[in-house]
Amino acid sequence: MAGFSKVIATIFLMMMLVFATGMVAEARTCESQSHRFKGLCFSKSNCGSVCHTEGFNGGHCRGFRRRCFCTRHC
């Protein structure tokens, strides 16, 4: 009987470990309008390239006026 409770406790501990490592919070993303991008933004890759030169992780086009917004982790 003592061996059975050790097995159950070990299984429970392993399940807790798996669930704890699976629940990782995602970092917040901050964004700022690009200061160097000129014209209308239609290409995410072009926007991202300009944002990289400004020190950001990436960028995307958004809004009715199609502006480039740079993104990074806060």
Curated annotation (Swiss-Prot):
Keywords: Antimicrobial, Disulfide bond, Fungicide, Plant defense, Secreted, Signal. Disulfide bonds join 30-74, 41-61, 47-68, 51-70. Residues 1-27 form the signal peptide. PROSITE patterns: GAMMA_THIONIN. Belongs to the DEFL family. Monomer. Plant defense peptide with antifungal activity against F.oxysporum and B.cinerea. This is Defensin J1-2.
